[in-house]
């Protein structure tokens, strides 16, 4: 038995392998049949295994099942007049049994020169090997695509993290977990869309290039429109456009799309990321929290089949009601040594934050100081799903003030495994209050805050036509996928994450 092509790239020099494969391609071209596109696949590996994997060998022999499969060669064993190969498609792998007598001498002679990574199409009948493996006994097999570059060694796989991100196509070929992650992502996003539509929401698309960046506190990317000779900004959030639609009478809208923020890279941050934002007239932040819980449970069921799963070695249960705590309540719960009186004392908060080496602004008020202490000491502790509610007005320029206490807003952020997953609030629909808060943001920007918002006069004009009482929420799709696929880094769940140029 020969080990010819038994593993993807062995110890040979890669350039030599590529040269040999180019020679094979040249010979294939000379035959006038290179890269055909007339093979029609009728079966996929995973479905065949699902239907026939448990059937007995005698049953398959008694009632032959003809199949047409196609995929990439991942393993090949040539044994004289009979050979085995394993091919892979998105659904899984299946073994092919190829003999000279069944496919003919010419085809078998060509077959022996095919390489790991080549893509083939095969016709045959299902059978079970002596070890019980479901296989295809080929009556015809064709080379469909020649692979010129060798795949990584199957025993070591693609282990270089940078290479995985830069060559995602190779990562998808070699790593089943990567394929699972992105299939799960697709299913999750589709389930979110279905959930929104089933609750009466209309999916819309809003501009990706804005004359004024708005809807979030973030530094934007800039670009220039040549024909209009104007500076534009890649959107940091779709919020202000979506709320314009609510003004226009679209009472329940949502959008799944990209945002761009010219900020740092981290396991939780990528400058280009996906958000789902939704807005509902005659709703408030309390009803939105209930809705968001239901949406996340549905996403988990669709992606994983369960609401209880393990993330990074710890169990997480989305089936239980999510906790709801104010900023001060959360700090005190996880750090009972900090008294409620201390947490409401500006001088104590400043001293504590100084000890923690936090960057303090002179104009930071009580609410900002409490939020900073929460972020420094408590945010990472919120493993179980927890809504942090009633954010200070000074850090929530688009949120409605609380009627009982105008220093806070009707706003929440949802944290799971110590990460912000969602941010929502009762929308500020008072145009005069919104204008005043925009002016405060302008002052902050002039004082050096690059993430402070611009004054958006056109949005104020839209509010002056009347925005009904409205609730809105944004959910980070990438972070949610991280959660549901047990992925430690946001780069693991973005097909082509931003990378530094090689």
Curated annotation (Swiss-Prot):
Protein biosynthesis recorded as keyword: yes
Domain of life: Bacteria
Any one annotated GO CC term: cytosol
Sites where the protein binds Mg(2+) 1: 413, 420
A GO biological-process term: lysyl-tRNA aminoacylation
Cellular localisation: Cytoplasm
Known cofactor(s): Mg(2+)
First-level EC class: ligase
Keyword Ribosomal protein assigned: no
GO molecular function (one): lysine-tRNA ligase activity
Known EC number: 6.1.1.6
Keyword terms: Aminoacyl-tRNA synthetase, ATP-binding, Cytoplasm, Ligase, Magnesium, Metal-binding, Nucleotide-binding, Protein biosynthesis
Cofactor note: Binds 3 Mg(2+) ions per subunit.
InterPro entries xref list: Aa-tRNA-synt_II, aa-tRNA-synth_II, aa-tRNA-synth_II/BPL/LPL, Lys-tRNA-ligase_II, Lys-tRNA-ligase_II_N, Lys-tRNA-synth_II_C, NA-bd_OB-fold, NA-bd_OB_tRNA
Catalyzed reactions: tRNA(Lys) + L-lysine + ATP = L-lysyl-tRNA(Lys) + AMP + diphosphate
Residues the record lists as binding Mg(2+) 2: 420
UniProt cross-references to NCBIfam families, sorted A to Z: lysS_bact (TIGR00499), PRK00484.1 (NF001756)
Subunit structure as annotated in this protein's UniProt entry: Homodimer.
PANTHER family named among the record's database cross-references: LYSINE--TRNA LIGASE, CHLOROPLASTIC_MITOCHONDRIAL, LYSYL-TRNA SYNTHETASE
Family listed: Belongs to the class-II aminoacyl-tRNA synthetase family.
Name of this chain's protein: Lysine--tRNA ligase
Source organism (scientific name): Aromatoleum aromaticum (strain DSM 19018 / LMG 30748 / EbN1) (Azoarcus sp. (strain EbN1))
Gene symbol of the encoding locus: lysS
């Amino acid at each position: 038995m020969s080990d010819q092509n038994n593993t993807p790239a062995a110890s040979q020099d890669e350039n030599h392998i590529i040269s040999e494969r180019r020679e094979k391609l040249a010979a294939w071209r000379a035959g006038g049949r290179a890269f055909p596109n007339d093979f029609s696949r009728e079966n996929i590996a995973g479905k065949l295994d699902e239907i026939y994997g448990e059937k007995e060998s005698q049953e398959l022999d008694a009632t032959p099942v003809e199949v047409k499969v196609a995929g990439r060669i991942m393993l090949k064993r040539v044994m004289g007049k009979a050979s085995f190969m394993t091919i892979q498609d998105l659904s899984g792998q299946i073994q092919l049994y190829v003999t000279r007598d069944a496919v003919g001498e010419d085809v078998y002679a060509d077959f022996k020169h095919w390489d790991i990574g080549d893509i083939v199409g095969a016709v045959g009948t299902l059978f079970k090997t002596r070890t019980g493996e479901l296989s295809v006994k080929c009556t015809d097999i064709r080379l469909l695509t020649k692979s010129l570059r060798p795949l990584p060694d199957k025993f070591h796989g693609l282990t270089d993290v940078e290479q995985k991100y830069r060559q995602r196509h190779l990562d998808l070929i070699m790593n089943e977990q990567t394929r699972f992650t992105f299939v799960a992502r697709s299913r999750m996003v589709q389930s979110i869309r279905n959930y929104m539509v089933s609750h009466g929401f209309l999916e819309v698309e809003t501009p990706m290039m804005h004359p004024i960046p708005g809807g979030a506190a973030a530094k934007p990317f800039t670009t220039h429109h040549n024909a209009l000779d104007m500076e534009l900004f890649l959107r940091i959030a779709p919020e202000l456009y979506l709320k314009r639609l609510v003004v226009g009478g679209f009472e329940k809208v949502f959008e799944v799309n990209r945002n761009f923020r010219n900020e740092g890279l981290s396991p939780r941050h990528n400058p280009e990321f996906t958000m789902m934002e939704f807005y509902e007239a005659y709703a408030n932040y309390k009803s939105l929290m209930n809705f968001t819980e239901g949406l996340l449970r549905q996403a988990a069921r669709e992606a994983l089949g369960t609401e209880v799963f393990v993330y990074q070695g710890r169990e997480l249960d989305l089936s239980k009601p999510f906790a709801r705590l104010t900023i001060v309540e959360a700090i005190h719960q996880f750090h009972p040594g900090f008294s409620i009186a201390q947490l409401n004392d500006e001088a104590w908060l400043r001293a504590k934050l100084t000890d923690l080496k936090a960057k303090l602004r002179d104009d930071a008020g009580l609410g900002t100081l409490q939020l900073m202490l929460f972020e420094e000491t408590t945010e990472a502790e919120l493993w179980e799903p927890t809504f942090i509610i009633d954010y200070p007005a000074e850090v929530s320029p688009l949120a409605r003030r609380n009627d009982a206490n105008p220093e806070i807003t009707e706003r929440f952020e949802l944290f799971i495994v110590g990460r912000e997953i969602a941010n929502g609030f009762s929308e500020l629909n008072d145009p005069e209050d919104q204008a005043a808060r925009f002016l405060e943001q302008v002052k902050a920007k002039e004082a050096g805050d690059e993430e402070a918002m611009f004054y958006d006069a056109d949005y104020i004009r839209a509010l002056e036509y009347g925005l009904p009482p409205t609730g809105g929420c944004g959910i980070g799709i990438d972070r949610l996928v991280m959660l549901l696929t047990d992925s430690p880094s946001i780069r693991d769940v973005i097909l082509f994450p931003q990378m530094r140029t090689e």
